[in-house]
Structure formats: C-alpha cells, structure tokens
C-alpha cells in the first residue's frame, strides 16, 4: 500500500473542495501485496486502485475484462461512499459477517467476492454491476442525514 500511496502523491493534483467531490483512480500493473487475487482496493477516502492485469486475467469466454472492470469500479466506488456499514449502521441486515463492509447478497455489486479474481471463475454470465435495494436505501438514508 505504501508504494500505491507514493504513486498517488506523485500524480494527484485535484482534491475535493467546497461542493466538489474528486475521486482518484489508479490503474496499476501487478497485484496487491496483501491479497494477490484482489482486482481493486479502496485505500483512502477518495482513492482506489484497479489492478488491470488481474482484471484481464480474470476475463474468459463468457465474461469480458470490460464487464469485470465495470463491476470492480462500481464496487470500489461503493466503498468510497461508505458501503457497507463503513461509519454507519444499516437498518438492513445485509453485511456479510465473514467479510466486513461487504454485502451478503451475491446479486449486489457490493458482494465481497466482486473484488476477487476467484469469483469470476464461478460465473456464467455478467457480474453484478449495480447496488442492490439495501445498498441504495443506505445511500438514500445517508443523503438524508438519517444514518
């Protein structure tokens, strides 16, 4: 993670300010040293990294690298928004107890395995790339200041 932070610090020139929210996305070669199956990681409040080679390696006949990339982008963005139970407690019981800050719903883009290369070997169609109803409700309640 230290190397990722160094790369961001050398490249990033836009930050949030006023009403502007800025997201910094790094596309990196190689892999995350703490989990070599990770396809992406959210590592700061407005930053996440995508491991392009790992995403391409996860693609196969039925699932394109573009579909995987889209799912991982939305998943990591969800973490930046606070999903699941990051700094709040959801009124819905949808956090996977074995994978904190991830959904227990395989149809949600916040499902824990979305960011893992192993997950895509088990699919026979497009991966989820949208938030489920509980994720959307949590985001709505956060927007309203109720969480």
Regions found by a protein language model. Give the residues of each.
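Active-site-proximal segments of metallohydrolase catalytic domains
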Residues: 1-53
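Ser/Thr-centered flexible coil motifs
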Residues: 1-5, 132-137
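Residue-identity detector for glycine
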Residues: 17-18, 30, 40, 45, ...
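Short linear sequence elements within intrinsically disordered, low-complexity coil regions
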Residues: 32, 136-139
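The catalytic-center signature of Zn2+-dependent metalloproteases
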Residues: 56, 60-136
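Pan-zinc metallopeptidase signature
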Residues: 141-147
């Amino acid at each position: 993670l230290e190397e990722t932070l160094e790369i961001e610090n050398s490249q990033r020139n836009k930050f949030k300010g006023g009403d502007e929210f800025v997201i910094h996305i790094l596309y990196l070669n190689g892999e995350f040293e703490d989990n070599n199956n990770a396809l992406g990681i959210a590592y700061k409040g407005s930053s996440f990294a995508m491991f392009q080679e790992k995403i391409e390696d996860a693609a196969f006949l039925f699932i394109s690298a573009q579909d995987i990339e889209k799912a991982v982008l939305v998943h990591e963005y969800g973490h930046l928004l606070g999903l699941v139970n990051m700094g709040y407690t959801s009124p819905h019981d949808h956090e996977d107890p074995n994978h904190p800050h991830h959904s227990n719903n395989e149809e949600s883009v916040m499902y824990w395995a979305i960011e893992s290369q192993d997950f895509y070997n088990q699919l026979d169609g497009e991966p989820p790339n949208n938030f489920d109803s509980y994720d959307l409700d949590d985001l709505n309640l956060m927007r309203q200041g109720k969480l």
